Amino acid sequence: MYGISLIGTGESIRPAKAKEPEVKDLKEAYKTIEADHFAPRMEISFINGDKRDTLSYEKVTWNIGGEEKGLRYGENPGQEAALYKLVNGNLVLGEVEMLGSNQPLASIPELLQSGKHPGKTNVTDADNALNILRYLTDKPCAVIVKHNNPCGVATGSTLAEAYFRVNKADRLAAFGGCIALNRDCDMETAKLIVENYAEVVVAPDFAPGVMDVFATKKNLRVFRIKNMARLTDFVAKHVIDFKSLIDGGIVAQTSFSANARKPEDLIPAYCNRKITDKATGAVTYEEHKIKRLPTAKEYEDLVFGWLVEAGVTSNSVLYVKDGATVGIGTGEQDRVGVAEIARDKAYTKHADWISWEKYQKPYNDLRLAFGEEDGAKKQAEIMEQTRAEKGGLPGCAMVSDAFFPFRDGAEVGIREGITSIVQPGGAIRDWDVIDCCNDAGVAMVFTGQRSFRH
């Protein structure tokens, strides 16, 4: 049985004295840099009898204004925080080899422009963007993350096109987000980025002149992570994922890695339905299998969507089309509800984009910009177009991080015109969902792997 010892070396950890800010002080609280008391080094040891495997860490700081500083604060002002990089330790648990200390990514980002001092959420948002981008290296790709979930993910023939498409996917949520790019940021992409408000930009490197463009945004944090050029090295590697409990306990697990990364990894949906004769108790099995296989284009979107799913909080359902997210539903407790939320978000974002293209105004601002009567008329016209186009959902692939227990979840997407579904499979009523798809002419594939994320 493994035991875990957590050893801080150097200065001991002393919690800061709690202070209740007055309302007038709240704005200042967001500007305050917490002086953390975390030790400069940390070790975590896995002990099994006489065997001890130790992971060694060092605290990360940046030179900001001539001073060495760590994280601004944790998730909220008043929470001390520290970022540690792994400097030593090659751990093997069973047959699973953990990622070694010579391949850092988000734990040692090079801060090229500090803007506002980086905080914990800036680093974790960048990390989850990399968690998605590690699977999507074949084409230029952009991810925008906020609150540890993607606002959008999109590929393109160029990096600028990928950024344009990801911003279009959810222009509203992208405001103040963390933008991560899987190619060196060029001038065209940089000029598009500064047209909007972003908190963080992360890329392998930046072309000459790009930092001058970013300098016009004084609060923008710009991180260079050179190892992003080797993102494929991180696809099948694992790390130890620690979760602290409220009583100080720790849950340790190996990190998730998506197994279905290409079309041939996806399984055409099938199952054997168990039927028990009520009179005799005799058991027979009835085969159910999907009638239509995905097209080549659908396979591309199914794989893309499943890999994006690895970075979305559960329960989640996504709609994707042509290598871009259309609607993302996150963090819900029922699968039908999250499918509906993703659908509703697709409609909302579609309407907002129509408004932006026509009037250079957000949909919600049309009444302010054009007056109550004219603005309401414009909104009604946009909503009529959005409904006619079903929020851009026809032809989408529907992605679910866990199986559909009943057909009702799949039916949410089918009513909007989705043409393919990817999900883990394994529900007792898989047969019902398969029949539902066959009735609608929808292709469905299984991954054989759940993709929960909490």
Spans of features found by a protein language model:
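Glycine- and Gly-Pro-enriched alpha-helical subdomains that act as flexible
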Residues: 151-171, 318, 326-406
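Thiamine diphosphate
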Residues: 128, 338, 410
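Amphipathic, non-transmembrane alpha-helical secondary structure
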Residues: 187-191, 343, 407-415
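Active-site/ligand-binding-proximal alpha/beta "capping" segment
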Residues: 293-295
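Conserved helix-loop functional segments at active or binding sites
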Residues: 311, 348-352, 415
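C-terminal binding/interaction regions
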Residues: 196-231, 254, 392-454
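Active-site loops and adjacent core secondary-structure elements that bind or stabilize anionic groups
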Residues: 1-212, 216-280, 285, 298-307, ...
